[in-house]
């Protein structure tokens, strides 16, 4: 299965009638492997800061998580495994695997829990595959 198929079929799938706003799978080096059409343009620096927060949990807390022009307030996640952010009625979930970051962005009516489930389910699968 191609990386784009993982994004299209496993991240942008319908959950209780709702979809993520956008999603991507990005390498630890910040290069996008696959992304939905609406995924924001981001800087390599954005991904470097996210990777640093996985290595040093709390790194993003003072400044927030930036993805392109959008700033998310970092909320409770799982140190070294999952970063969650909130902005207004939406937010972001980032799951780290051995080689990639699985990123999902949502807005109402999708809930944070639904976004977490979609992103973490694919991330856990990729981890089990050694990816």
UniProtKB/Swiss-Prot annotation:
InterPro entries: PFN, PFN_euk, PFN_sf, Profilin_CS
Locations listed in the record: Cytoplasm, Cytoskeleton
Coiled-coil segments on the chain, per record: none
Entries under SMART domains matching the protein: PROF (SM00392)
Keyword Transcription regulation applies: no
Key words of the record: Actin-binding, Allergen, Cytoplasm, Cytoskeleton, Disulfide bond, Phosphoprotein
Disulfide feature: 13-115
Pfam families: Profilin
One GO CC term, this protein: cell cortex
Protein origin, superkingdom: Eukaryota
Modified residues (Phosphothreonine): 111
Post-translational modification as stated in the protein's UniProt record: Phosphorylated by MAP kinases.
Gene Ontology molecular function, alphabetical: actin monomer binding; proline-rich region binding
Sequence motif Involved in PIP2 interaction, residues: 81-97
Gene Ontology process terms (BP): nuclear migration; regulation of actin cytoskeleton organization
Record's miscellaneous remark: The variability of the residues taking part of IgE-binding epitopes might be responsible of the difference in cross-reactivity among olive pollen cultivars, and between distantly related pollen species, leading to a variable range of allergy reactions among atopic patients.
Subunit structure: Occurs in many kinds of cells as a complex with monomeric actin in a 1:1 ratio.
Reported function: Binds to actin and affects the structure of the cytoskeleton. At high concentrations, profilin prevents the polymerization of actin, whereas it enhances it at low concentrations.
PANTHER family: PROFILIN, PROFILIN-A
Family to which this protein belongs: Belongs to the profilin family.
Protein name, per record: Profilin-8
Protein's organism: Zea mays
